[in-house]
Amino acid sequence: MAHKKGQGSTQNNRDSAGRRLGVKKYGGEVVIPGNIIIRQRGTKIHPGKNVGMGKDHTIFALVAGVVTFHRKDKKRQQVSIVPAA
């Protein structure tokens, strides 16, 4: 017969690493084609002119220029690039 009780284990001691989401290039910053502007889950910010959107909703630059953020309508925000002349 055992004289010591078995050790219990905790259940809630797991945590995942942060996903490094957010704005990577802010308004007024200069970008080149392929630069990631925003990493996001879902379309929190929508793509505008001269930007593309990846399958994970990452917004990236299609042309060289300056990043601008603006409102599409009351609810939706949009990011575009003003091409470098």
Swiss-Prot record:
Source superkingdom: Bacteria
Gene3D superfamilies recorded: 2.40.50.100
Database matches in PROSITE patterns: RIBOSOMAL_L27 (PS00831)
Chain segments annotated as coiled-coil in the UniProt record: none
Pfam family, one: Ribosomal_L27
Record bears the keyword Lipid metabolism: no
Nucleus is among the record's keywords: no
Keywords for this protein: Ribonucleoprotein, Ribosomal protein
InterPro entries (alphabetical): Ribosomal_bL27 (IPR001684), Ribosomal_bL27_CS (IPR018261)
GO molecular function terms noted in the UniProt entry: structural constituent of ribosome
Gene Ontology biological process terms, A to Z: translation
GO cellular component, one term: ribosome
Region annotated Disordered, chain positions: 1-22
Family the entry assigns: Belongs to the bacterial ribosomal protein bL27 family.
PANTHER family: LARGE RIBOSOMAL SUBUNIT PROTEIN BL27M, RIBOSOMAL PROTEIN L27
Stated name of the protein: Large ribosomal subunit protein bL27
